[in-house]
Amino acid sequence: LYNWYAVNTNKLCPTGWHVPTDAEWSVLTNYLAADGHSGIQATALKANSGWNSGGNGTDDYGFLGLPGGFRNFYGTGNFYGIGYYGSWWSSSQSSASDAWYRLLSYLHDPVSRASNGKEDGFSVRCLRD
């Protein structure tokens, strides 16, 4: 898991790839809705194994979303939600202290869009340029 400052270095992805922007994540979720997965986008992206509490998905698009959890920087700096949540940074800031990310949850089906402190740790996906 990486904090957003590591994302912002542009060194996490190989040449010819980049961490998607918030807008690029929205293109993905909008496509899923238009392709018949409205309201169930998370199921279509989640891996078909590895999720706790009946949270496995169908992985219809080969995204293989796994529940790597997240790291909360403030407080103890512990890792949380492994097996229950998958969180991926975007390369877009929402404010000077926060950045956008996407969340898959074992509990609900939409792909959630939220912003969080740049010090926290989330997974990273690379998108081909």
Spans of features found by a protein language model:
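Conserved positions within compact, well-structured domain cores
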Residues: 1-129
